[in-house]
Amino acid sequence: MKIMQINLVDYKEWTESLGYDREWKIQNFQHGFLSRLNEIAAEINSFIITYRYDSYIMLLDGVLIGKNDYILTKIKELSPVPIDICFGYGKTLLDAERNCSINMDNILLAKDEKVLVAHFDLDGFSRKRFLFDAYLEVYKIYNKLFNYAMELGGLAYYFGGDNIGIFLGVDNINKVIELANSFPNMKVGIGIGNNPREALKNAAEALHIIRIYRDRKIEIVDSKN
């Protein structure tokens, strides 16, 4: 599987240069920057995952790597600090992240893999009366999914609200179904696509099917071609 890692160089030093009354400025930049990164990624059928606001992972399977210069130009226009990138390829997304290198040759020659996204949707979340109790419940589930995804070499990502995604290779489909069955109050839409955006779209369609028929809690939508 393939990734590009985008790092903001000397980001901490830049935040400290904003003065003491800076936290609102930092938050404003971080959310705005991520919003634009998501738009750029969507243009090339990719998706952005981040666990910290000075480093981002762009999923590249099924994405035209030749658009690299376009991506970098766009990102550099948005960033207040220099950008450093590396490319990773491996059997799993975790392997790809750990094999990250500035050399593009290996990733250009590597085969594109299909992308699997399991979109977990917690039942009854919106009916919970207390905000913090609801958040704590989602956080506990996210922590479990994060650790399980890591064991399989995948990445878990919190989409917001009661929605959590796991990104993996398609060879993990049976393990994902087994995991989904271990949560009694969870709908799980599994999308398989030729690129990250397509896989996410298929996962959303799978959830829609679950909501319509109400006789299942797991559904799979696969782009066969």
From Swiss-Prot:
Q: Which GO terms describe its molecular function?
A: GTP binding; GTP cyclohydrolase IIa activity
Q: Name one GO biological process term.
A: biosynthetic process
User: What is the enzyme's class at the highest EC level?
Assistant: hydrolase
Reactions it catalyzes: GTP + 3 H2O = 2-amino-5-formylamino-6-(5-phospho-D-ribosylamino)pyrimidin-4(3H)-one + 2 phosphate + 2 H(+)
- Going by the entry's taxonomy, the superkingdom of the source organism is recorded as Archaea
InterPro entries, per database record: GTP_CycHdrlase_3, Rev_trsase/Diguanyl_cyclase
Query: Which keywords label this protein?
Result: GTP-binding, Hydrolase, Nucleotide-binding
Keyword check for Hydrolase = yes
Q: In its keyword annotation, does this UniProt entry include ATP-binding?
A: no
List its EC numbers: 3.5.4.29
What does the UniProt function comment say about this protein?
A: Catalyzes the formation of 2-amino-5-formylamino-6-ribofuranosylamino-4(3H)-pyrimidinone ribonucleotide monophosphate and inorganic phosphate from GTP. Also has an independent pyrophosphate phosphohydrolase activity.
Q: Which family does it belong to?
A: Belongs to the archaeal-type GTP cyclohydrolase family.
Q: What protein name is recorded for this chain?
A: GTP cyclohydrolase III
Organism name: Sulfurisphaera tokodaii (strain DSM 16993 / JCM 10545 / NBRC 100140 / 7)
Top-level taxonomy: Archaea, Thermoproteota, Thermoprotei, Sulfolobales, Sulfolobaceae
